[in-house]
Amino acid sequence: MIRRERPELGIVLSFFSPSGYEVRKNYPVADIVCYLPFDTASNARRWVETINPEMAIFVKYEFWGNYLEQLKKKDIPTYLISAIFRKSQSFFQWWGGTFRHMLGCYSKLYVQDEASARLLAGINVHNVDVTGDTRFDRVTDICRTTHEIAQMEALKNTGKKIIVFGSSWKADEQLYADWLRSHTDICGVIAPHEFDNCRLQKLKEEFTTKQGDTILLSELTSITDTADIYKCTKQLKCIIVDSFGQLASLYRYGDIAYIGGGFGHGIHNINEAAVYGIPVIFGPKHQKFKEATDLINCGGGFEVSGKTQLESILNTLISDEKTLYTSGKAAGSYIARNIGATPAIFKSIFDI
């Protein structure tokens, strides 16, 4: 939105993790896309002096003490958007003075919900607006602009149910591998969160069965002849996604989405799938993500704690069209109800 409404401004987009950087390293909206150097005093000082920003915007959990200190020292307006706070966080403990000091470096904090605003008020942080989560706007924009993939359209037309396993880890695959292999009328799209050639090859071998082939997405999309596409998709069992940046476009072809990470450090982006009006399934480690609880409560999301529960939910969804439809509709409606944070924050920051 900044690029569209304020095209004269330069935009530097930084990431700390490879998973974010790899997806956006060629992002045309930003003038510079780069990694953020480690949060040391010297790195922060050099970074701020080199970039010399007019303002800085951090997202959700971006609390980098040295960077915040340098930005405040230079009187650079600094904002935190889509933030969400929990009582268990360090800011709200008796020993959390250093962390509370970080909050004082922000010019304003834009939080997702009233509960976060109340927690902050309890420690005398009042420069707070409740605006919601910008990720709802982002996934809605992606949904509206995703490109069609002809080979996936052909797969959809075969009548097979398609389940997208997004940001999948080995712990996730251990839960759904047997079920997926045993259901000949299901095609799986597996997008591993991290991969190399060895991991991709192992996934191909693991999910190829006598009833169907498993191929890489790049192999599928390289087929351009209509007859060859039809022949390939008719006998497909599984597609392994072997490039970054494709997952958000692939969810549109799914009937169900399983989002990985819930048996590790925490679930990945479930809104990317829910926006397409399909039910989302995920593991138990989702406490940091308000949208997971909200989706469970509205009937659009399902938490699973193990293999048996996952298989039960998958069996219900693929065998009961009414449940599949109502769950998907609930997920899509939840996303639609929560859009609007981005324009609200933009108007506030730029005083429109």
Predicted segments, located by residue:
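Conserved catalytic-core segment of nucleotide-activated headgroup transferases in glycan assembly
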Residues: 1-7, 148-220
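C-terminal alpha-helical cap of glycosyltransferases
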Residues: 338-352
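Active-site and donor-binding regions of nucleotide-sugar-utilizing enzymes
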Residues: 1-145, 164, 168-170, 183, ...
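Nucleotide-activated donor-binding/catalytic signature segment of Leloir-type glycosyltransferases, i.e.
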Residues: 24, 28-32, 203-241
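Catalytic binding pocket for nucleotide-activated donors in carbohydrate/polymer assembly enzymes
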Residues: 106, 122, 247-333, 348
